[in-house]
Structures are given as C-alpha cells and as structure tokens.
C-alpha cells in the first residue's frame, strides 16, 4: 500500500539511480565473529544485467509498459508492431555520426518523462542522420526521399521561417515522424551493406 504514496516519476528515478550504483558481490570473506560474511569484490556489469532483467518483469506490466534500457533509462515500450524496429542495434563505421545519434534519439523519445520538446529534439536528431546519409548519396528513391525532407524542412522541426507548418497535433505527428525516420534509416543502412543486427 505504501508504494501508492510515491509518484511514478519518483519511483522511476529511484530505479535509474539504483541501476547506476548496483554491483554483484563476487568474492566473500567470512569470519567467525558473529558468523558474518563480507564481499571482497564486485562486478558492476553483472549486477546491472541482473537488476535490469528482474526489474523489467515488473516494468513491462506497469501501465502501457516500460523497460529499463542498458544505458540506465526507464523507457516506454514501443507499440508491439514497432518493438523490433526500436530494438534493432545499429553498428556502422560512422559511430558518432550515425550509431550514437540513433541511440540518443531513441532514448530521448521513449524516456518515461520525455516532453514534447524532447520528442522534437529526438525527431530532429534522426533528421540529422538522414541528412548525413544524404551527403553520402544514401537516400530513398524518388518521391519517398522528397517526402522525408519535406517533413524535415517544412514542419517546424529545424527551420524557422514563414513557410513552416506548425499548427498540427505534435504528440500524434511526432510519433509518426519518429518511427518513419527511424525505419527509413534502418532500411537505408541495410540496403547499403552497413551492419544492422536484430536483437
């Protein structure tokens, strides 16, 4: 009953704190004095993996479903039909320009306390990845590519001018933009022989 006195934000922040600081005891030293045992060494990675596995059993059942990611953020679980897309691990030879930006955008968009501004930043970051790929002539064919960059350039995501379309439901359309950009990036990388591993 007591857990109901705490907000979701408080509990999730506590989970993130515990994940950052948890370690698994590895080597014990026992003494005769009061029959006590003390750990002499710890493994942080193993501790985090076990903690994440255990806590995710409960987080998945809470509200719409959440998960604790490897980076230590409590994230909203993507819709079932898009979960594989979100969990696809991208590995390219342009880690800073592509891999890290995709990971940062995904974490920012799906984080339990993300705001509309956070979601806009996440969409814009994926747009930066598309722009980077475009500079290397990695683009969708024909009208599809034009449509992607029409969204980026004319829907108040990264430019500020009179032709921007800004009167739309941000919550709904940012979700559409995010998953459209993410799926387009993964498709382009697969088509161009970059390594994309499905977990």
List PLM regions with ranges.
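Helix-loop junctions and short alpha-helical segments
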Residues: 13-102
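Alpha-helical structural elements of signaling/regulatory helical domains
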Residues: 47-54, 114, 139, 161, ...
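Alpha-helical oligomerization segments
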Residues: 124, 135-199
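Conserved aromatic-histidine-acidic binding/catalytic patches
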Residues: 3-6, 43, 47, 93, ...
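HEAT-repeat alpha-solenoid elements in large eukaryotic scaffold proteins
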Residues: 126-130
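N-terminal leader/presequence regions that precede the main folded/catalytic core
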Residues: 1-15
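A mid-sequence, solvent-exposed acidic-amphipathic segment
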Residues: 92-125
């Amino acid at each position: 009953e007591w857990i109901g006195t705490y907000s979701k934000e408080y509990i999730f922040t506590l989970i993130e704190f515990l994940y950052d600081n948890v370690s698994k005891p590895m080597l014990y030293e026992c003494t005769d004095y009061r029959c006590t045992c003390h750990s002499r060494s710890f493994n942080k990675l193993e501790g985090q993996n076990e903690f994440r596995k255990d806590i995710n059993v409960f987080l998945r059942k809470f509200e719409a479903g959440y998960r604790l990611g490897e980076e230590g953020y409590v994230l909203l679980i993507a819709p079932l039909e898009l979960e594989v897309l979100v969990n696809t691990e991208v590995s390219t030879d342009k880690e800073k320009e592509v891999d890290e930006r995709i990971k940062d955008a995904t974490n920012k968009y799906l984080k339990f306390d993300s705001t509309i501004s956070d979601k806009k930043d996440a969409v814009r970051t994926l747009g930066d990845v598309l722009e980077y790929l475009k500079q290397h002539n990695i683009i969708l064919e024909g009208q599809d590519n034009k449509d992607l960059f029409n969204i980026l350039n004319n829907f108040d995501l990264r430019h500020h001018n009179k032709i921007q379309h800004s009167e739309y439901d941000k919550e709904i359309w940012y979700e559409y933009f995010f998953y459209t950009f993410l799926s387009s990036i993964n498709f382009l990388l697969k088509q161009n022989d970059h390594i994309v591993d499905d977990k």
